[in-house]
Amino acid sequence: MGGEYPLNCSAPGKVLLSYSESDDIKAYFNDPISKMTENTIVDYSHFISEAINIRQSGYAVDDEEFAKGIICIAAPVFNCEGCVVACVGLSTLTLYDSIHSLTNKKLELLKGVADEISKKLGYSAKE
């Protein structure tokens, strides 16, 4: 619990960065980025493609991008103005689960929690 995780290789970080202004995303990738594992995204173009998927699907995954053996899913939390102000994430070890199993078993629950928090913050999704 606690600690700091890079925005480009953690599911919560990827959610927050994906919903940032495009200039902020570019600025983030202008700084040197460490490749934490062979799965870490360090290329701006690759991340933009991932960010589009995150915005469309409403969640992000970290498939051993931050550290070998650790996987995570995260969903955005919106405020009353429709801005992402936080996210809800769930991490586990590959010893216990796979990213596909975690996504299939827990994603809807996770997104439901994020939606409930968003509603409490005054967010109303546009249908």
Give the ranges of each region predicted by the language model.
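Short, solvent-exposed recognition segments
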Residues: M1-F66
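Residue-level detector of alpha-helical recognition elements and their boundaries
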Residues: D31, T40, Y44, G69, ...
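Short hydrophobic beta-strand micro-motif common in sensory/regulatory domains
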Residues: I71-A75
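Sensor-regulatory modules in signal-transduction proteins
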Residues: V77-C80
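Juxtadomain coupling helices with adjacent low-complexity linkers
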Residues: A86-E127
